[in-house]
């Protein structure tokens, strides 16, 4: 029962048999097109976003299992705002403004994969990601928003 795990990042709903998937899965003896179809079916909700996927191949039986992870926080922020990409100059140009309600929604989606113990801490991690994407939070810079969270200004969202 030899198991091999292949971890890749694919665009939701658009995996192909080409690199990086094909060369990684091909030598393991499973039908690549079946793997691609399953990945595309499981990631269709994340269309256009980068999604971490784990393909677990049972090499002796030539069977496989596909586990789909949650997209990076930056991709979820861009999806919530309908942005193609973040700011090219994050500290100088603002790409958008996100509400605390959407920050909390993203934090709830990502909380299991984060190191944060509380929803408030998870939200602060997501706000930190807003720095690199170039997105303001409730009209404030991400650093100001984190201070406001610490000060209790947004506590109503965490109850």
Swiss-Prot record:
Keywords in alphabetical order: Ribonucleoprotein, Ribosomal protein, RNA-binding, rRNA-binding
GO biological process: translation
A molecular function (GO) term: large ribosomal subunit rRNA binding
Pfam families recorded: Ribosomal_L11, Ribosomal_L11_N
InterPro entries: Ribosomal_uL11, Ribosomal_uL11_C, Ribosomal_uL11_C_sf, Ribosomal_uL11_CS, Ribosomal_uL11_N, Ribosomal_uL11_N_sf
CC per GO annotation: large ribosomal subunit
Subunit structure as annotated in this protein's UniProt entry: Part of the ribosomal stalk of the 50S ribosomal subunit. Interacts with L10 and the large rRNA to form the base of the stalk. L10 forms an elongated spine to which L12 dimers bind in a sequential fashion forming a multimeric L10(L12)X complex.
Family assignment from sequence similarity: Belongs to the universal ribosomal protein uL11 family.
Biological function: Forms part of the ribosomal stalk which helps the ribosome interact with GTP-bound translation factors.
Annotated protein name in UniProt: Large ribosomal subunit protein uL11
Lineage start: Archaea, Methanobacteriati, Methanobacteriota, Methanomada group, Methanococci
Gene name per UniProt: rpl11
């Amino acid at each position: 029962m030899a198991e091999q795990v292949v971890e890749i990042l694919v665009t939701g709903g658009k995996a192909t048999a080409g690199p990086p998937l094909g060369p990684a899965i091909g030598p393991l003896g499973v039908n690549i097109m079946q793997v691609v179809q399953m990945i595309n079916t499981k990631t269709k909700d994340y269309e256009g976003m980068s999604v971490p996927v784990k393909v677990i191949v049972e090499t002796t039986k030539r069977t496989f299992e596909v586990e789909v992870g949650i997209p990076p926080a930056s991709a979820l922020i861009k999806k919530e705002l309908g942005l193609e990409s973040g700011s090219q100059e994050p500290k100088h140009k603002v790409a958008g403004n996100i509400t605390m309600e959407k920050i909390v929604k993203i934090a709830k989606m990502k909380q299991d994969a984060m190191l944060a113990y509380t929803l408030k801490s998870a939200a602060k991690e997501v706000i930190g990601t807003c720095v690199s994407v170039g997105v303001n939070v409730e009209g404030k810079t991400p650093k100001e928003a984190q201070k406001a969270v610490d000060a209790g200004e947004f506590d109503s969202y965490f109850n």
